[in-house]
Amino acid sequence: MTLFPRIASGGALFLLGAVGAWAQSDAKDLYMDKCAVCHGADGAGKTAKGKKLKLKDVHETAAKMKADEMVKIVENGKPPDMDAYGKQFNAAQIKGLVEYYRSLAK
């Protein structure tokens, strides 16, 4: 293997690690800023907006939905109540949000 492919593959691994580190460290902040107003800090959906929308508790949602289904809902929304965030957030951010939300059920 020549030097360039080694450097390129090492750089790619570094970037993947950086994305993973972002998802772990900042997903909670993003969730609290954008999601908790409806879903609640604990994922219970017991906020004023959550009650109005009749949101389900994270324990029920996480048990019934796979992570990839949740990713699609965050990306595309769930009209009429859930806005789409696919244009606001990148794939790593959305994945991090879903992972953080699901972690609230543990």
Tell me the role of every PLM-derived stretch.
Residues 28-54, 76-80, 103-106:
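Periplasmic/extracellular electron-transfer cofactor-ligation site
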Residues 56-68, 85-93:
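Electron-transfer interface patches adjacent to heme c in soluble/periplasmic c-type cytochromes
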Residues 15-30, 46, 67:
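Electrostatic cytochrome c docking/interface patches
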Residues 73-75, 80, 86-106:
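C-terminal capping alpha-helices of c-type cytochrome domains
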Residues 1-24, 100-106:
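Post-cleavage N-terminal segment of exported redox proteins
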